[in-house]
């Protein structure tokens, strides 16, 4: 499956000026793990629970053009990816510098 590189407008509006945005589903355990990872790093995230948002279905459809599964994480307005990319970035030591560059982490 080919994914779009550029987020659709509805996603760009939600991502806005927030350093870290996570699109999740409230019952997804992988989503919970990603949210806890960022919280454990001391990052204040903006979370959109797709199953609780009024425009959740539209958002989900737009996000599936970017990633095959939730959570879908944006750092500094750029798509980081889903749980696999987040964890790989964390394990490789690349996540913290990305968060610092985005202004989400100061230490």
Language-model-detected regions and their locations in the chain:
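Short secondary-structure boundary/capping segments
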Residues: 12-13, 71, 87
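Ordered, helix-dominated protein-protein interaction surfaces in large eukaryotic regulatory proteins
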Residues: 30, 36-40, 61, 65, ...
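Structural motif
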Residues: 55-60
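Short beta->alpha junction loops
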Residues: 49-54
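C-terminal alpha-helical interaction module
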Residues: 2-11, 16-17, 93, 99-107
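Non-catalytic, surface beta->alpha helical segment in thiol-disulfide oxidoreductase systems
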Residues: 74-107
């Amino acid at each position: 499956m080919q994914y779009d590189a550029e987020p659709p407008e509805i996603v760009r509006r939600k991502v806005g000026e927030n350093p870290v945005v996570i699109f999740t589903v409230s019952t997804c355990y992988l989503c919970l793990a990603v949210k806890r990872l960022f919280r454990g790093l001391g990052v204040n995230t903006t979370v959109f629970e797709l199953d609780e948002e009024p425009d959740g279905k539209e958002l989900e459809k737009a996000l599936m053009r970017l990633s095959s599964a939730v959570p879908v994480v944006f750092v500094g307005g750029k798509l980081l990816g889903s749980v696999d990319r987040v964890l790989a970035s964390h394990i490789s030591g690349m996540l913290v510098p990305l968060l610092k560059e985005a202004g989400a982490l100061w230490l």
